[in-house]
Structures are given as structure tokens and as C-alpha cells.
A protein has these predicted regions:
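Basic nucleic-acid-binding interfaces
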Residues: 1-33, 37-87
Length: 87
């Protein structure tokens, strides 16, 4: 059984996920946070860059903004790891 905790997602993994969802990083001049946008979402995705892994409540909030379920994220995460192992 594959169990993925949202609190164990690294910044690099979350950035890869955002890019795969069509999000674009915006330079907001704040080095402690990253801001990502995507057409069609109501708020920007923001997370701290000095806390790795990303806290679970930040992950939940950002997935809610993207209108993506935890299950969809976990399927993406597991699929990505499977592709990496096959390579």
C-alpha cells in the first residue's frame, strides 16, 4: 500500500507538480516565498521556500486553490515515482 503524506512533499516535488499543472512562477521580489499563478484560479499559489518539506496545511490550501483533490495529487505523485524507477 502506497501512503503519501501531504506533509512529506519536498519543495522540488511541489514545483514539478505546479509546472505539470500549467502554473507559472511569478517573481514577486520576496526571496522567502514563491508565488505561482495559473489562468482560471482565483488566488495565487504561495509557499515558503525555507521550509522543506512543505507543511501539510500549506499543501492542502494550495491544492484547494488549484481545485485538485488529495487523491489526484497522490496519483500524480505515485505516477511520477513509478516513471522515475523505470528509467
Amino acid at each position: 500500500m502506497n501512503t503519501v503524506r501531504l506533509g512529506n512533499i519536498s519543495i522540488a516535488e511541489f514545483k514539478a507538480f505546479l509546472e505539470s499543472m500549467g502554473c507559472v512562477r511569478v517573481d514577486n521580489g520576496n526571496e522567502g516565498h514563491e508565488k505561482w499563478i495559473k489562468p482560471g484560479i482565483t488566488r495565487p499559489i504561495i509557499f515558503q521556500t525555507h521550509i522543506d518539506p512543505i507543511p501539510e496545511f500549506i499543501m492542502r490550501n494550495n491544492l484547494r486553490i488549484l481545485e485538485i483533490s488529495r487523491k489526484e495529487f497522490v496519483e500524480w505523485h505515485i505516477g511520477k515515482k513509478t516513471k522515475t524507477k523505470k528509467s
